Regions:
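Residue-level signal for inorganic ion chemistry
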Residues: 5, 94, 132, 191
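ATP-dependent carboxylate activation and anion-phosphoryl transfer catalytic cores
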Residues: 1-68
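Acidic, Mg2+-coordinating active-site environments of NTP-dependent enzymes
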Residues: 61, 146, 150-205
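Walker A (P-loop) phosphate-binding motif
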Residues: 56-102
Length: 205
């Protein structure tokens, strides 16, 4: 989207015939002059830009998979990302091992921090994304996405080491971990580890 400023007597007529000229091409145009012009009536340019970028029949969300648990979450996240990659999707992965785009490693330190994970969501080439998180990241930073298509819970994390975040006992953990289920879209699904009784109990939600 660019803004083109031109001087013309009549914009409906060819420029050459009336000596019109382009004054400026702006890669980041302001919308205020169109929404609140000094003269003339306002134009819904924001709506027109959004309609151009997102057609009515287009899907505004990419498939997002969230993974949380006590152990095996990193391996699970990498496996899911690989399966999505095999489907031909340009897949972003945020895990304890780093930040990945397809088979390329963008960051070889933990990519679970909110800002690191956001790098995937703002990347226009990403067609699917997998996010590994921990109870600590969930409590301190929240999830880097608002909703997901699939939420995976591999095990019920322990409360040990979370006292600074007001988690004193293991009994509080289901209320923390169920967040991964609560953000699943209505047309999505939660995947619970049936070998973990505490995780299975989350099915009631």
């Amino acid at each position: 989207i660019a803004g083109v400023d031109l001087v013309a007597l009549d914009i409906s007529k060819p420029m050459k015939a009336q000596g019109a000229a382009i004054v400026e091409v702006n890669a980041g145009p302001g919308l205020l002059m169109h929404l609140k012009p000094a003269t003339g009536k306002p134009r819904p340019v924001g709506q027109a830009i959004a309609a151009h970028l997102f057609a009515p029949e287009s899907e505004p969300r990419i498939p997002v998979v969230g993974v949380i648990g006590q152990e095996n979450t990193t391996g699970t996240s990498h496996l899911i990302a690989w399966l999505l990659h095999l489907q031909g999707l340009q897949t972003g992965l945020s895990s304890a091992k780093g930040l990945f785009l397809g088979q390329r490693c963008l960051q070889n330190q933990s990519g679970m921090e909110w800002e690191s994970a956001q790098r995937l969501l703002i990347n226009r080439s990403v067609e699917a994304a997998v996010f590994e998180t921990t109870a600590r990241h969930l409590l301190s930073e929240g999830l880097p996405y608002d909703r997901c298509l699939v939420g995976v819970i591999t095990a019920m994390p322990k409360a040990e080491g979370l006292q600074d975040l007001y988690i004193q006992s293991d009994e509080q953990m289901p209320n923390v971990v169920r967040t991964q289920m609560d953000v699943v879209l209505p047309n999505g699904m939660a995947v619970l580890n049936a070998d973990d009784a505490e995780v299975v109990n989350l099915a009631q939600y």
